[in-house]
Amino acid sequence: MAVSLLLRGGRIRALKAALLEAKVFRGELASTVPLSTESENNKKAAGPTSKTESVFKEPTLVPESSDTTTYKNLQHHEYNAFTFLDLNLDLSKFRLPQPSSGRESPRH
């Protein structure tokens, strides 16, 4: 909703809509947070009630080893001072000419 207001009317309407949405979300979250913590405490105290809950436990995740000494995808980090100019030159053959009205532009 805020995005459509930003596109239609401007920043003030979008800001008002975002603030109103934030108040709505804040109100919803404030009412559900105590309920969710109470239910988690009750489940832990009661334990699994059926056989299926005990069978389908989440597997423990093994942390992946991360090697930070080498970066595998170097194509994004090979920039230099002429990178933009090189790309501009490469893509210039695909550009269309600018449209003109047929009149000469005023020279100041």
UniProtKB/Swiss-Prot annotation:
GO aspect biological process, one term: mitochondrial ATP synthesis coupled electron transport
Mode of membrane association: Peripheral membrane protein
Subcellular compartments: Mitochondrion inner membrane
Keywords: Electron transport, Membrane, Mitochondrion, Mitochondrion inner membrane, Phosphoprotein, Respiratory chain, Transit peptide, Transport
UniProt KW Transit peptide keyword: yes
Residue(s) carrying Phosphoserine: 105
A single GO cellular-component term on record: mitochondrial inner membrane
Top-level taxon in the UniProt lineage: Eukaryota
UniProt-listed InterPro entries: NDUFV3
Positions of the UniProt region annotated as Disordered: 32-67
Pfam families assigned to the protein according to its UniProt record, in alphabetical order: NDUFV3 (PF15880)
Transit peptide: 1-35
Subunit structure comment from the entry: Complex I is composed of 45 different subunits. This is a component of the flavoprotein-sulfur (FP) fragment of the enzyme.
Job of this protein: Accessory subunit of the mitochondrial membrane respiratory chain NADH dehydrogenase (Complex I), that is believed not to be involved in catalysis. Complex I functions in the transfer of electrons from NADH to the respiratory chain. The immediate electron acceptor for the enzyme is believed to be ubiquinone. May be the terminally assembled subunit of Complex I.
Annotated PANTHER family: NADH DEHYDROGENASE [UBIQUINONE] FLAVOPROTEIN 3, MITOCHONDRIAL, NADH-UBIQUINONE OXIDOREDUCTASE
UniProt family annotation: Belongs to the complex I NDUFV3 subunit family.
Protein name listed in UniProt: NADH dehydrogenase [ubiquinone] flavoprotein 3, mitochondrial
Organism the protein comes from: Rattus norvegicus
Upper classification of the organism: Eukaryota, Metazoa, Chordata, Craniata, Vertebrata
Gene: Ndufv3
